[in-house]
Amino acid sequence: MPELPEVETTLRGIRPHLQGRILKSVTVREPRLRWPVSEAIYALRDCPVVALRRRAKYLLIELEHGQLLIHLGMSGTLRVVDMDLPLRKHDHVDLLLDSGKVLRFNDPRRFGSVLFQGGDQPHSLLQSLGPEPLSDSFNGQWLFARSRGRKVAVKSFIMDNATVVGVGNIYAQESLFMAGIHPSRAAGRISLARYQALAEAIKRVLAQAIEAGGTTLKDFTRADGQPGYFAQSLNVYGRAGQPCVQCDAILKADRHGQRSTAYCPQCQR
């Protein structure tokens, strides 16, 4: 599933092609995504694109009188292509620009979404979200305060969007390894000092992943069609049964929710 670095990489790839352009029209070939394509999208014509930004894992395209929200789901990608480029399988939505280019949404598994919110009010999906992990408002003090009395595993705690947005399975595992914290440790039993280390690890891991263009394991490609290269830097994710890069102990795996979690039994406590 594309996580925050992949969405941020996509944003940086498409922004130069969309910001300041005119959205001429929208073509929907398959409306049956995670949520049906918003009815209002079909009527969009000649809309100036004011800005593009990201909130959590949502790409937000700001128009003069509303906002498009795009979520990549499990397998979605966005590419900026010539309008006459032949379609590929699973090309579900096209946003035609006045430049003759098209922002094309491809999603084999159809867990993504393309939604519209009119007016100035934020979409309901954007409400009740925690801070952005790369912002100044996210720090160890925030994690420490929110975790008091919580018995949930710290990995599940930092993957909760009410705690902090965009820290998915891959980057939660990598951040906990960098901070030396066992993923199963109860969130409420971690000290302020260790949460400060974890917050810094989350920021560092996400920044490194963005710099590498995200992580391509199966479906994800950047807006230019190229893969992300952070997979070459993974220390624990997908490496259970292999030696730890720091101490050579064999990495183990636990399950949190429906996800397998790799960790080092020596380095993470």
Curated annotation (Swiss-Prot):
Oligomeric form and interacting partners: Monomer.
InterPro entries attached to this UniProt entry: DNA_glyclase/AP_lyase_DNA-bd, Formamido-pyr_DNA_Glyclase, FPG_cat, MutM-like_N-ter, Ribosomal_uS13-like_H2TH, Znf_DNA_glyclase/AP_lyase, Znf_FPG/IleRS
A GO molecular-function descriptor: class I DNA-(apurinic or apyrimidinic site) endonuclease activity
Protein name as it appears in the record: Formamidopyrimidine-DNA glycosylase
Binding positions for DNA per the UniProt entry: 90, 109, 150
EC numbers: 3.2.2.23, 4.2.99.18
Gene that encodes the chain: mutM
Family membership noted in the UniProt record: Belongs to the FPG family.
Function: Involved in base excision repair of DNA damaged by oxidation or by mutagenic agents. Acts as a DNA glycosylase that recognizes and removes damaged bases. Has a preference for oxidized purines, such as 7,8-dihydro-8-oxoguanine (8-oxoG). Has AP (apurinic/apyrimidinic) lyase activity and introduces nicks in the DNA strand. Cleaves the DNA backbone by beta-delta elimination to generate a single-strand break at the site of the removed base with both 3'- and 5'-phosphates.
Note accompanying the cofactor annotation: Binds 1 zinc ion per subunit.
Biological processes per GO annotation: base-excision repair
Phylogenetic classification of the source organism: Bacteria, Pseudomonadati, Pseudomonadota, Gammaproteobacteria, Oceanospirillales
Cofactor dependence: Zn(2+)
Protein source organism: Alcanivorax borkumensis (strain ATCC 700651 / DSM 11573 / NCIMB 13689 / SK2)
UniProt catalytic activity: Hydrolysis of DNA containing ring-opened 7-methylguanine residues, releasing 2,6-diamino-4-hydroxy-5-(N-methyl)formamidopyrimidine; 2'-deoxyribonucleotide-(2'-deoxyribose 5'-phosphate)-2'-deoxyribonucleotide-DNA = a 3'-end 2'-deoxyribonucleotide-(2,3-dehydro-2,3-deoxyribose 5'-phosphate)-DNA + a 5'-end 5'-phospho-2'-deoxyribonucleoside-DNA + H(+)
Residues annotated as the enzyme's active site: 2 (schiff-base intermediate with dna), 3 (proton donor), 57 (proton donor), 259 (proton donor)
Keyword list, A-Z: DNA damage, DNA repair, DNA-binding, Glycosidase, Hydrolase, Lyase, Metal-binding, Multifunctional enzyme, Zinc, Zinc-finger
Zinc finger feature spans (FPG-type): 235-269
